[in-house]
């Protein structure tokens, strides 16, 4: 008689649910893609990085804690962790609202860039929502004229096409970018970015991205944002940089004020076929930026499970 084989035990690792979201748009497939993971408290940083690479969204946000109006989050590109991401934060707000885990009560997120208060605005029917986020503190620094030609040429342009009446500078509301003003929005469509050179210039200037922008109205701008240094050849619609741009313009008196507030719109993503729209409000005292808020809509595209 043969011996009876003991019953086998099978162990499976817990699977992680995620959502893929289009931010700064109400149309799936447009705007800027973000991954959202609501229950990431048991994931290691290495697992978060692998999941972000798996999703291949420009950024993925992971919620490691959420209770009593306070959340703790981390942001990853497909190649590395970053301090903050605007469009992923808008996407997170949408997912929380759709899941019934946020109904507009006070909510703050702890990020590597500081605490970010969120505000939820529902439409009259309660279907669509707009997520507003307070940006981290605004900062700016000069970019010497010696860099102007190199930056323009890295985008395939002559420096004669730079707008001399708008600021060319580095600025941040969470992530540093260098902002390059162009004479006309039509120039954005014809950019020929040299991505290795842009990455090199970004490293030398201590920024995450090179952001080209042009006016299309008194307080409206079109833009493209290149971030190959952090694994994003072109970011479709960039909330953090959009906030920094409008804050930079307001600090230099280039936006109309109502009292001590300026507002504006940024259109981005058209060159990639994924248009989106960013709303920005800036509070200023003289030339000092006291607060920046960025808002937008988002649409959940799909949900899935990552087996790890």
From Swiss-Prot:
Q: Spell out the family assignment given in the record's similarity comment.
A: Belongs to the PhzF family.
Name assigned to this protein: Uncharacterized isomerase DR_1330
UniProt EC number: 5.1.-.-
- What keywords appear on the UniProt entry? Isomerase
The broad enzyme category this protein falls into is isomerase
| UniProt-listed GO biological process terms | biosynthetic process
Q: Which residues form the active site?
A: 59
**GO CC entries:** cytoplasm
Q: Which organism is it from?
A: Deinococcus radiodurans (strain ATCC 13939 / DSM 20539 / JCM 16871 / CCUG 27074 / LMG 4051 / NBRC 15346 / NCIMB 9279 / VKM B-1422 / R1)
Q: Which SUPFAM superfamilies match?
A: Diaminopimelate epimerase-like
Which one of the record's GO molecular function terms can you name? isomerase activity
